[in-house]
């Protein structure tokens, strides 16, 4: 990945289009930067909260990495591919996007709300705050918990489970 990251900065410096893997490297760095700018943990790392925290951080990173790239003078041209098939937290990311679509929640709306969460909410509280801000009028807390706990499952399993809700 370091080779791709160096290549990304070289492409930006030379005003050239980045490759898909170079953009993926930039999105990965943005994902990690987002951790540095978040409120992080209130009560120390809670292992059960990690999967959802990483899912939301990755979702936001995939949606917004072109703005990060633009700060260096570059342009994200593979945004659609990375949003859909990025390499970080693949099942969680794909399933979360499926969940949003299933309930008619636009990715732009979700991006804004999750971006706000990254800045004002401790990771420990993501589960409840996500429900309150995005899914409260769509899912009971019981169904929401069951769905969130299945985000890491394979796409087919997740899609089949979602049909039951």
Q: For each predicted feature, which ranges?
A:
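The DNA-recognition helices of helix-turn-helix-type DNA-binding domains
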Residues: 32, 64, 117-121
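Short runs of predominantly hydrophobic/aromatic residues within well-ordered alpha helices
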Residues: 26, 30, 53, 92-96
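Post-HExxH zinc-binding segment in Zn-dependent metallohydrolases
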Residues: 46-92
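Pan-zinc metallopeptidase signature
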Residues: 89-165
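Short pre-active-site segment immediately N-terminal to the catalytic Zn-binding motif
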Residues: 2-29, 43-48
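Generic structural signal for hydrophobic core residues of well-folded globular domains
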Residues: 33, 37, 60, 64-65, ...
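Active-site recognition of the HExxH zinc-binding catalytic motif
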Residues: 23-43, 58, 62
């Amino acid at each position: 990945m370091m080779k791709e990251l160096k290549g990304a900065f070289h492409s930006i410096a030379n005003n050239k289009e980045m490759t898909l893997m170079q953009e993926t490297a930039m999105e990965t760095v943005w994902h990690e930067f987002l951790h540095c700018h978040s409120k992080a943990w209130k009560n120390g790392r809670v292992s059960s909260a990690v999967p959802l925290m990483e899912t939301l951080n990755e979702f936001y990173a995939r949606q917004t990495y072109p703005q990060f790239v633009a700060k260096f003078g570059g342009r994200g041209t593979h945004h659609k591919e990375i949003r859909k098939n990025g390499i970080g937290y693949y099942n969680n990311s794909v399933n979360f996007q499926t969940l949003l679509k299933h309930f008619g929640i636009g990715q732009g709306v979700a991006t804004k709300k999750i971006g706000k969460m990254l800045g004002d909410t401790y990771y420990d509280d993501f589960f409840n705050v996500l429900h309150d801000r995005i899914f409260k009028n769509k899912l009971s807390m019981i169904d929401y918990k069951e769905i969130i706990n299945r985000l890491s499952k394979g796409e087919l399993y997740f899609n089949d489970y979602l049909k039951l809700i």
